[in-house]
Amino acid sequence: MKSAAILALLAQALAVTAQPVEGDRTPGTRTLDLPNFPGGSVPTRGVEKRADLPPDNGGGNAPDPDKVHIVGVTYGGTGCPDGTVSHVLSDDRQIMTLIFDQYVAQIGPGVNTKENRKNCQLNINLRYPGGFQFSVFSADYRGYANLEKGVSGTQKSIYYFSGQTEQTSTSTTWKGPIDKDYILHDEANQTSTVWSPCGANGALNINSQVRLTATDRNARGILTNDSVDTSFKQIVHVRWQQCTN
């Protein structure tokens, strides 16, 4: 059951909480000024889930959970500029909590074009026993899309390890008119899975973005990595295997 324990452990690694973080700033709900959509109010939103969580890979290919630790996180980007991300590492060094305040893309009359695309580069340092390596096989994202006709929104993520050129990417595009919460489960193609180096700790990089385009310059849209409070929830699932060399 070690593999199941590892998956449960790292599935929480980037989970979001709304509790104050001791020693850091106190995050809170931020009200977002939505564009003026026809009707004057935001209609009821549905929830979309793209796929179910994949099964545990099983077997004895995972390291002891007590020897897997998140030792540091760095970040940067227009969606997470300095000072806009709260983070805390649990006492057992097993859980990383991140809360983003400015991960929102907007488009429409009077909106600066710089607001059409937001991105965030995350670097997550993991320490784990030698003889093992891991890969990201899926990630969950939760957000909100309100797009008028003529507006398209894209959420994309790229995963890679420091010092390696191989990448795994996932992407989803919505076309307006649409108004809904979304829950995405991105599962990497098995043929393009990227593994951390053997015999070395893995620095996992996640470069994510939300982007809006429009064929009608009068159309409006907003795309976030969570609903109106704009807190961003991301859960990363990993697969372990023993090194073969």
Swiss-Prot record:
Pfam families: DUF4360. Residues 21-66 are annotated as: Disordered. Residues 1-18 form the signal peptide. Keywords: Glycoprotein, Secreted, Signal. It comes from the Eukaryota. Disulfide bonds: none annotated. Glycans are attached at residues 189, 225. It is found in: Secreted. The keyword Glycoprotein applies. GO terms for cellular component: extracellular region. This is Uncharacterized secreted protein ARB_07590.
